[in-house]
Amino acid sequence: MIEKVLELGCGRKKRAGAIGVDILADSDADVVHDLDVFPYPFGNDEWDRILCFDVLEHVQHFVACVEEIWRIARPGATVEVSGPFMSSVNYFSDPTHRRAFTSRTFDYFIEGTPSFRYGYSRARFRLRACDFDRDQFPFRRGLHRFLLGWANRHKAQYEDRYAFLYPVYTVYFELEVIK
């Protein structure tokens, strides 16, 4: 069976084999749609993989967008998200960014985390992976490689104490849809 892949905010660099969605008509999008307009033009449980690379930081209604992603994803589907880390110069330099991310951004949707108890949403995910600067700088050497490795192994301590001393650029999530 062929995996159905949806790329939200594909811009002009849509991944091969994906159906692209973007707000801009002159993008590579197959579907032109504003991610802050609900519902999305897809059925329930339709997608096996949803890609959200550098797009969710631009939406106004983050929780509603995550709920829509959950609605249109099949049970067990993979959702990949990347966005600017809270101490990244890229977060602060782009006037269209509405939010930054930390390793705990999706905890509100993950059972067993302290933030889940607030009950913001019925959308549920399992965290498969969370990495700082994944694939961003594959040739980092020496001190940079050591510090990035340390930050990825000690996320809470890094975010609480050292994020502005040694800022990373992006945070990447791989989530599994739970229904």
Residue ranges of predicted features:
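Conserved SAM-binding loop
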Residues: I2-S88
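S-adenosyl-L-methionine-dependent methyltransferase catalytic module, highlighting the catalytic core
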Residues: V63-A64, E68-W70, R74, T78-K179
